[in-house]
Swiss-Prot record:
This is Decoralin. One of its GO terms (biological process) is defense response to protozoan. Keywords: Antibiotic, Antimicrobial, Cytolysis, Fungicide, Mast cell degranulation, Membrane, Secreted, Target cell membrane, Target membrane. Expressed by the venom gland. Signal peptide: none annotated. Linear cationic alpha-helical peptide that acts as antimicrobial peptide. Has antibacterial activity against the Gram-positive bacteria S.aureus CCT 6538 (MIC=40 uM), S.saprophyticus (MIC=40 um), B.subtilis CCT 2471 (MIC=40 uM), and B.thuringiensis (MIC=40 uM), and against the Gram-negative bacteria E.coli ATCC 25922 (MIC=80), E.coli CCT 1371 (MIC=160), K.pneumonia ATCC 13883 (MIC=80), and A.faecalis ATCC 8750 (MIC=40). Has antifungal activity against C.albicans (MIC=40 uM). At high concentrations exhibits activity in stimulating degranulation from rat peritoneal mast cells. The natural peptide is not C-terminally amidated. However, amidated synthetic analogs show a much more potent activity in all the biological assays. It is found in: Secreted; Target cell membrane. Its main location: secreted. One of its GO terms (cellular component) is other organism cell membrane. Coiled coil: none annotated. It comes from the Eukaryota.
Amino acid sequence: SLLSLIRKLIT
Protein backbone atom coordinates (compact mmCIF):
# COMPACT_ATOMS: atom_id res chain seq x y z
CA SER A 1 0.00 0.00 0.00
CA LEU A 2 0.99 3.65 -0.18
CA LEU A 3 1.76 3.73 3.52
CA SER A 4 4.25 0.92 3.11
CA LEU A 5 6.04 2.75 0.31
CA ILE A 6 6.14 5.99 2.23
CA ARG A 7 7.36 4.23 5.34
CA LYS A 8 10.09 2.56 3.32
CA LEU A 9 11.25 5.92 2.02
CA ILE A 10 11.24 7.42 5.50
CA THR A 11 13.09 4.50 7.05
